[in-house]
Structure formats: structure tokens, C-alpha cells
Regions:
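Bacterial Sec-dependent N-terminal signal peptides
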Residues: 1-29, 34, 228-234
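Hydrophobic core residues within well-ordered beta-strands of beta-rich domains
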Residues: 29, 60, 74, 108, ...
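Short glycine/proline- and aromatic-enriched beta-strand/turn motifs that initiate or cap beta-hairpins
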Residues: 23-65
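Residues on the lipid-exposed face of transmembrane beta-strands in outer-membrane beta-barrel proteins
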Residues: 33-37, 60-68, 80-82, 110-116, ...
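Short loop/turn motifs that connect adjacent beta-strands in outer-membrane beta-barrel proteins
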Residues: 23-28, 73, 119-124, 185-193
Length: 234
């Protein structure tokens, strides 16, 4: 009987602690703007493409951030951002060395993450993890191509918008995680203002290429994003 009473008292104390902590949280909602730079590389099989080399390129990342604090150390965060995910392909087969293509892909990204925070009242660290959905809005390419005669190889520059076709998977999804740092530079009774720095890694789990009729050719984009933000909590 005494053990049951002790268990009951422990549960009551735990519940009271959570309620008391929540009651002391003045600002549950956080809204903000963010912007920065990212680097994207493509994960693709080299089967049948031994003369192709892929390398990452940079792109812009800017958008909105919304967060709801469940406790002092846990929040649910959702971002809505426009992101350019770019990479480069080079041909390295002797006389084709000058040939290359830059791929620039504009995406709308919607990550949903758990935000685990730690630290003091003003300076706090954040560990983020979750998933995201994305929509491929536009695709652009530029580079140098070639054409041949019996005796010569000619090179031409090209640049333009690429039209989507049935092989493109425009809706994609994946896992996202990273670290963040925030500093509250203004604290008022009804509002806090803070600046933030986030490093997030987006890992595609859905190929943006559906493949051909008799050939599977999955292509996944992986992006490291660094952004600065301005946040308002209320």
C-alpha cells in the first residue's frame, strides 16, 4: 500500500512540475524570417556514365519560420522556404573535357521538425530533426555541349529553362536534421526578439527522376543549408 502511495505522490509531483514549468512560459509562439546559402550534391549511380563527374554548387535559401513551444526544452517547428538546389556535371573523356552542365532547380520546401533546445534564457542551442515535403517549381540548365564532324569537334554554349516531362518527379520528400543557435537581444513582457543561426541537412528519400521504361535511374538531391534569421516570440 505504501508503495502505491509513493508512486501516486511521484506522479502528482511530476505533473505539477510540468504544469508549473508551462505556466512560467510567457511566449509559446515564435515567428520569423530566414535567409542564407546552401550547397547541393546529387546521389546518382555511375552505371553507364563512367565519363561523368558530379560536384556540388551553391544556391539561395530564404523563407518563413513558425514554432510552437510545448515545454521549455521542446517545440514543434515548421518552415516554408524557397530553395535553389544546384549541382554540376563535367564530362572527362579526353576530347570532351570542355563539356559541362550546371543544373539549377528551384524548390518550395516544407520541413516539419522537433526542436530540442538547451541553454540559458538569452543564448540557447537547438537540435532539430524531422521530415520534409518539397515541390520542384522550375529547372534551368547552362553549360557547354558539343557536335562532331568527320574531322573536328565543335563546342557550343547553351543556357535556358528546361521543360518538365513524364520522367520528372516534381513532388519529393525526405529527412532533415541539424543544429541551431539563437540569441534573444530584446526581452519585453509580451514579446521577445532574437537572432538565429541554423545549419540543416536535407536528405532526399524520393528520387526526382522516375526512370525510363526499361532502366531505373534514381537521382537524389542532398542539401546543406546555412541560414540567419530574425525571430519574434509572443
Amino acid at each position: 500500500m505504501k508503495k502505491n502511495y509513493l508512486k501516486l505522490i511521484a506522479v502528482v509531483l511530476m505533473c505539477w512540475t510540468v504544469v508549473e514549468a508551462n505556466a512560467q512560459m510567457n511566449h509559446r509562439w515564435t515567428l520569423g524570417l530566414k535567409g542564407g546559402w546552401n550547397w547541393t550534391n546529387i546521389d546518382r549511380s555511375n552505371l553507364g556514365r563512367i565519363d561523368e563527374t558530379y560536384s556540388p554548387l551553391g544556391g539561395f535559401d530564404f523563407g518563413l519560420q513558425a514554432k510552437y513551444a510545448i515545454t521549455d526544452w521542446l517545440a514543434i517547428r515548421a518552415d516554408f522556404s524557397a530553395m535553389t538546389r544546384s549541382y554540376r556535371m563535367d564530362r572527362n573523356l579526353h576530347y570532351l573535357d570542355p563539356v559541362y552542365t550546371k543544373y539549377s532547380n528551384d524548390y518550395l520546401m516544407l520541413p516539419l521538425m522537433a526542436d530540442f533546445s538547451f541553454g540559458g534564457k538569452r543564448l540557447r542551442g537547438h537540435a532539430l530533426c524531422g521530415g520534409y515535403g518539397a515541390y520542384w517549381v522550375t529547372a534551368n540548365t547552362e553549360g557547354k555541349t558539343y557536335w562532331m564532324t568527320d574531322y573536328y569537334v565543335y563546342f557550343d554554349d547553351f543556357k535556358g529553362k528546361r521543360e518538365f516531362n513524364s520522367e520528372d518527379q516534381r513532388f519529393t520528400a525526405g529527412a532533415v536534421g541539424g543544429l541551431g543557435l539563437s540569441y534573444a537581444f530584446l526581452s519585453l513582457p509580451k514579446m521577445d526578439m532574437a537572432i538565429s543561426l541554423d545549419a540543416l541537412y536535407y536528405y532526399d528519400l524520393v528520387s526526382h527522376h522516375k526512370g525510363y521504361a526499361h532502366l531505373s535511374d534514381p537521382r537524389y538531391l542532398n542539401t546543406l543549408s546555412l541560414t540567419l534569421g530574425i525571430l519574434c516570440s509572443f
